[in-house]
């Protein structure tokens, strides 16, 4: 799958860029106000008790700031953070090596925690509840259990698929925080802040236009801003103006709803070739040349959220709103 401008997952070259933009304190974090308010209380209470923060589960769509929040939690608690991904913890020994190296109060951040193997997850249970590990050494008759005491720590788990977590793991998190898509006002503020970090001026109309097309996701907003900045610099404009912004987004094929060429390809397939549906997912996949799982996990959720697509027992179906929007878009292109 080619990387898309509106893909909510991080592109391979974006790690350093994202790191440079991330706020380090709650007061700098824009949006997610309910989560910020709750975390302020939980962190202050934990510090007053001189205890580590309770284990935190962060869940929601990609690109909304779960990794950023994990680092902010560590900064606010004034402790170190160790970051790993669920798939990288293949054996209980991998987890034991990391946990035994933590200092009291430290934060362990496990991204994609829903992808932990069952054997690693079972070792994690006593570590979360009672701060010890039971490790089996040897095999057969010579196998024996060794108990390793751990310093109190905070586990922050992040997932885009909270429903894929097992009940026992989910229940061991004392704090559950769901990140929601950002509103346009917060995205506008994020875009203006990012422009300042990049040393680029931007007019308010451009910030609003970018916010509208960012799919409620800061990662997408920052990516679009970077590309529009390219056009501004080539044009030798003193700042990003609305004319340049609209021109750039048009060439990037990101429309006013944040839909790109793949979204248009998929919806036009349903509307034009299959009379609006219902049509089976496998049929759509073959017609547009994409994998079924990619359509289901990457393309569909936003189209459904925006009211353009319905899932029915008989297949996918275009909504009246889809007919209105895509017919108009096709006329403009013609």
Swiss-Prot record:
Region (Small ATPAse domain (RuvB-S)), start-end ranges: 183-253
Binding site for Mg(2+): 67
Descriptive protein name: Holliday junction branch migration complex subunit RuvB
Task of the protein: The RuvA-RuvB-RuvC complex processes Holliday junction (HJ) DNA during genetic recombination and DNA repair, while the RuvA-RuvB complex plays an important role in the rescue of blocked DNA replication forks via replication fork reversal (RFR). RuvA specifically binds to HJ cruciform DNA, conferring on it an open structure. The RuvB hexamer acts as an ATP-dependent pump, pulling dsDNA into and through the RuvAB complex. RuvB forms 2 homohexamers on either side of HJ DNA bound by 1 or 2 RuvA tetramers; 4 subunits per hexamer contact DNA at a time.
Residue segments, region Large ATPase domain (RuvB-L): 1-182
EC number: 3.6.4.-
Head domain (RuvB-H) as annotated region, ranges: 256-334
GO biological process: DNA recombination; DNA repair
Compartments in which it is found: Cytoplasm
Keyword Cytoplasm (UniProt): yes
SMART domains referenced in this protein's UniProt entry, alphabetically: AAA
